């Protein structure tokens, strides 16, 4: 599976044949939401050698006990990032996770994902907090109101660059849903109901 000269199908079949059912199951799951660093009292808490982040003296990008557990024992590689202290901390944390994953059997990399982070207004919602140092853009409804696909295209290029710099490999925001229920939390992420 590590031989780049083989086809994707051959490599996948070889890797799948080496994995246990538990390892395969872990690769199909997502982690709980991850805040970096996980603050005590917050919704996404974590410990470092049994201590809270503030008590531990660890760097803000250190891997928590819980993160080590889901990487090593539960074989999870899909991770949902929520709050981050800063883009720099996010990038360093992502690098630490990737280094850790490389040392584990099979060296399967991390797939770090995020809900939208570039909304023009900081709502305070944990899924949209990306640090104030990234670009701000309209939500989906705002792009639809522009009636200019080039604006949306430029956003996609900018957000892609920023996400990769943060270590994020999967954006969970793009939606093609037509929203007809205004009470739905994801309404602003769609292009509206009259597209």
PLM-predicted stretches and their roles:
Residues 1-195:
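N-terminal beta-rich core of secreted/periplasmic extracellular enzymes
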């Amino acid at each position: 599976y590590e031989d780049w000269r083989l086809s994707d199908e051959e490599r996948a079949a070889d890797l799948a044949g080496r994995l246990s059912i538990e390892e395969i199951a872990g690769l199909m799951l997502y982690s709980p939401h991850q805040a970096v660093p996980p603050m005590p009292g917050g919704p996404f808490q974590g410990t470092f050698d049994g201590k809270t982040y503030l008590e531990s003296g660890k760097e803000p990008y250190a891997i928590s006990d819980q993160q080590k557990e889901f990487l090593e024992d539960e074989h999870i590689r899909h991770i949902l990032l929520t709050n981050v202290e800063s883009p720099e901390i996010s990038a360093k944390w992502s690098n630490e996770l990737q280094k850790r994953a490389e040392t584990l059997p099979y060296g399967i990399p991390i797939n770090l994902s995020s809900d939208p982070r570039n909304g023009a207004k900081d709502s305070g919602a944990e899924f949209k907090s990306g640090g104030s140092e990234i670009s701000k853009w309209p939500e989906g409804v705002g792009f639809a109101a522009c009636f200019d696909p080039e604006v949306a295209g430029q956003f996609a290029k900018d957000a892609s660059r920023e996400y990769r710099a943060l270590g994020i490999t999967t954006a969970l925001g793009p939606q093609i849903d037509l929203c007809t229920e205004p009470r739905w939390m994801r309404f602003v992420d769609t292009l509206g109901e009259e597209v």
